[in-house]
């Protein structure tokens, strides 16, 4: 993206960190097909986030929590906020007597249409989550990712057969239902920069009354990290210790991911300035990476 300036004249991209667990619960607590979404708690009203709970087959429940990385308090631990979420009586009552069988986490691209980069470059096309086709209000992106992949495949065939330029991919995308869906959802995420209450009110007006067709588009004014405040200006957060029944620590959670890698695998994160973590992020922000990292 940087090399080919694919983000030129686009809003800064927005990100979130998402957590997901699969539970096998008691039959009397299971309602196959039930879908639940929540917003807010345990986060404060200035922090963007919400949950999903899907009752699947075989007495399984998929539950997760997504937190926007534009939060202000560097002491916040997204993983621990997710664990705390499960202690709410409405959620705990579903999980009690059950067993956690899987855990996972991943970064999400939340910027939507305003931050969508140019989707073509010499010899390559951007599709799915690499481009940022997630529908953030619905926390769904598999369907849009697959459709963008199908459009990319059509473009490649046209390019090889008829020597049509790869730029036709973006034209196809803008004529598809994916673009229409992302356009309708474009104002939801940026509206929550005003806080939870105003964000919900605006989203209700935008999505329910106007069906995402308001005659203006809200902007993402800056990158996520710009909102982070110095550690000394924000209150520390005291998270309860895990009970290993409903809530768990990171170590036992990572064990359930099933991931593996070679011991000598090269480190994929490269520091431009090795002094920066100590002299800047640790000193000013109490090194938030030790908390936002999900493993």
Label the model's feature ranges.
Residues 1-217, 261-267, 276-277, 281-294:
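Residues forming the flavin
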Residues 200-261:
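Long, low-complexity segments enriched in small/aliphatic residues
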Residues 271-272:
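Intrinsic low-complexity, disordered N-terminal segments enriched in polar/charged/small residues
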């Amino acid at each position: 993206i940087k090399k080919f300036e694919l983000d030129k004249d686009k809003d800064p991209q927005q990100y979130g960190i998402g957590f997901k667990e699969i539970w096998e619960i008691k039959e009397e607590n299971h309602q196959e097909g039930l879908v639940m979404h929540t917003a807010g708690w345990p986060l404060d009203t200035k922090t963007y986030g919400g949950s999903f709970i899907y009752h699947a087959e075989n007495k399984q429940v998929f539950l997760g929590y997504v937190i926007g990385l534009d939060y202000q308090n560097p002491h916040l631990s997204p993983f621990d906020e997710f664990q705390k979420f499960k202690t709410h009586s409405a959620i705990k009552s579903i999980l009690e007597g059950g067993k956690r069988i899987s855990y996972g986490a991943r970064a999400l691209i939340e910027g939507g249409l305003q931050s969508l980069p140019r989707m073509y470059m010499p010899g390559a096309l951007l599709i799915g989550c690499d481009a940022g086709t997630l529908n953030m209000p619905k926390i769904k992106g598999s369907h849009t990712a697959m459709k963008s992949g199908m459009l990319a495949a059509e473009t490649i065939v046209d390019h090889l057969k008829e020597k049509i330029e790869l730029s036709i991919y973006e034209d196809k995308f803008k004529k598809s239902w994916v673009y229409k869906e992302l356009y309708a959802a474009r104002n939801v995420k940026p509206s929550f920069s005003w806080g939870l209450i105003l964000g919900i009110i605006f989203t209700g007006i935008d999505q329910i009354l106007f069906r995402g067709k308001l005659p203006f588009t809200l902007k993402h004014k800056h990158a996520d990290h710009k909102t982070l405040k110095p550690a000394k200006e924000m209150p520390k957060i005291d998270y309860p210790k895990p009970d290993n029944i409903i809530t768990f620590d990171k170590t036992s959670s990572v064990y359930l991911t099933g991931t593996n890698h070679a011991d000598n695998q090269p480190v994929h994160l490269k520091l431009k300035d090795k002094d920066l973590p100590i002299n800047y992020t640790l000193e000013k922000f109490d090194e938030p990476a030790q908390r936002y990292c999900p493993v």
